[in-house]
């Protein structure tokens, strides 16, 4: 039985074969939640820069802080978040902990994001993208 939201034959807002086709492309609720959690790791300009720094290989917190011109505590906080969502991993080497990308797809996501902003005028001006991006001081 078809549930109709408006009158007519399979028009807008009516359950029909087109809706079933759309649903085949939808992830289930659990997958959607996991995908959103993973995407949250990329949802901060500072984390994007941090992940970009790690794309070159394992780096310790102190070196990341110096390279990014931010405090070690800020870097550590962001790394904990990224580790909790599974994007980065850590390894102790003597007195230092080195971080690296745990998910190989992270470098591809960063590259795709970079390609998207370089290939579209929409993303050249943050105001055009509907977002106010501010640099951390």
Task: Describe each model-derived feature in a short phrase.
Residues 73-80, 92:
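Recognition helix of helix-turn-helix DNA-binding domains
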Residues 66, 77, 83-84:
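Alpha-helical residues within the helix-turn-helix
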Residues 83-93, 100:
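Beta-hairpin "wing" of winged helix-turn-helix
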Residues 29-73, 97-106:
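N-terminal helix-turn-helix DNA-binding core of bacterial DNA-binding proteins
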Residues 60-62, 85, 121:
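Functionally engaged cysteine thiol sites
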Residues 1-34, 103-137:
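Amphipathic alpha-helical dimerization/coiled-coil segments
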